[in-house]
Swiss-Prot record:
Keyword Calcium: no
NCBIfam families per UniProt: rpsS_bact (TIGR01050)
Name of the protein in question: Small ribosomal subunit protein uS19
Domain of life, per lineage: Bacteria
UniProt keyword Transmembrane helix present: no
The species this protein was found in: Renibacterium salmoninarum (strain ATCC 33209 / DSM 20767 / JCM 11484 / NBRC 15589 / NCIMB 2235)
GO molecular function: rRNA binding; structural constituent of ribosome
Biological processes, Gene Ontology terms: ribosomal small subunit assembly; translation
Single GO cellular component term: small ribosomal subunit
Sections of the chain in a coiled coil: none
Family, per entry: Belongs to the universal ribosomal protein uS19 family.
InterPro entries: Ribosomal_uS19, Ribosomal_uS19_bac-type, Ribosomal_uS19_CS, Ribosomal_uS19_SF
Function: Protein S19 forms a complex with S13 that binds strongly to the 16S ribosomal RNA.
Keywords: Ribonucleoprotein, Ribosomal protein, RNA-binding, rRNA-binding
Length: 93
């Protein structure tokens, strides 16, 4: 169920302060965060945010199409290495 519109988007306070400081200075430094639950807001456009995936920080460049999504959606936590090939035909001969 989506968040109520009257509440507005959720952004962790420490992340919001870091983005506001970068906007105020006019710089585009990488912002490191562990807050995967924070929603991407228009103030974050053009910034690179390093989102933690449980092991390392994945740099995510925020574009206009990402607004309204959560940061964790763009830093995958599981690595898929592919299925093992089933080689039954070779074993019969």
């Amino acid at each position: 169920m989506p968040r109520s519109l009257k509440k507005g988007p959720f952004v962790d306070q420490h992340l919001f302060v870091k983005v506001a400081n970068e906007n105020e200075k006019g710089t585009k430094n990488v912002i490191k965060t562990w807050s995967r639950r924070s929603m991407i807001i228009p103030d974050m456009l053009g910034h690179t945010i390093a989102v933690h995936d449980g092991r390392k920080h994945i740099p995510v460049f925020v574009t206009e199409s990402m607004v309204g999504h959560k940061l964790g959606e763009f830093a995958l936590t599981r690595t898929f290495r592919g299925h093992v090939k089933d080689d039954r035909k070779g074993k019969r001969r």
